[in-house]
Amino acid sequence: MNYTLLNDFSQIDSNEWNTLLKESIQDTPFLRYEYQKTWWEHKGGGEWKDAKLLLITAHENNQLIGIAPLFIAEYENEPAILLNGSIEISDYLDVIVKKDDHAKFISGLLDFLASSFGDTWSKLDWYNLPDDSPTLLALKEEANKRGWMHREEVYRPTPRIALNGSFEDYLSRIEKKQRHEIRRKMRRAAESELNVKFNLIGQDADIEKEINTFFELMIQDPNKAEFLHPAMREQMTSVLHEAYKNNYLWLGFLEIDGVKTAASLNFDYQNKLWGYNSGVSQAHRDLSPGWVLLAHTIQWCCDNNRYEFDFMRGDEDYKYRFGGVNRFVMRSQIKK
């Protein structure tokens, strides 16, 4: 394999990137070209101040074999190489390479990083690797082979709901008390005189207006309001516009008495829904708008044959009450 360092995302074709991603070990919204490029332009909404892009490609017989979207920055008082998208807003990260090429790609990548940038970094620190990623074992084996220190730990749970039938099938598989609670809240909302409606934003929407409405609901939560500082809002707005343009943004609202009262922001990608964020107004709390909207979201998944709802990172109680089962993302470190 021939490895090349690129200085900018403009040096690689977006279609070539996304085509390889479709056959890669992981195909997630966070690894698509437009997401990775947008994340880098905003440095994670200001998460990283001083960072240098290390966008590395590998070719074999003039064919693109692998992509390692990386950057180098001072982290925990050491110069570290991280996956582009680290850490806070990209739930799943990895290298982009087919399974059959993966082991030799990782081995060659570490050789390239050691020979080309050996004096500029002291560790690899890769967050948000899915727990079934072959990259985890490959990094461990390569570190052992080189006599480097290796450490791996669980970083965050990522609860998921497996879906393979109707909404009633889904309800029948969750705990009885929660099943009754979901049904009761949905029925109460449906019978309300306030005309409760679930609406999904279409491709003809005024997307800027809808995104701003979502943000207005999101910041009703004080913690989310603190998170959504101006640089992060700019970052997320750009990401959502790209997802909308590429037809995988899923934005649903619950309207009560003609007013959008709860919002569910997801990525509809690879036949599953990836639950990215949400927002709920303080109005009409008696109708449980957040719960009712989540139930409608899962019902939409069932009606449209999505095989999974992925809550992504976080161990909030409601995820398990709706039937989420833990998977995890990992942190893998290598020190020379």
Functional labels for PLM-detected ranges:
Residues 162-163, 333-336:
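Short beta-strand-to-coil "C-cap" segments at the C-terminal boundary of structured domains/repeats
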Residues 328-330:
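C-terminal end-helix/capping segment
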Residues 157, 203, 315-316, 333:
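Conserved beta-strand edge residues that scaffold enzyme active sites
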Residues 2-82, 86, 128-285:
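A conserved beta-strand-loop-helix scaffold within acyl/acetyltransferase catalytic domains
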Residues 59, 73-154, 270-322, 326:
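Acyl-donor binding region in acyl/amide transferases
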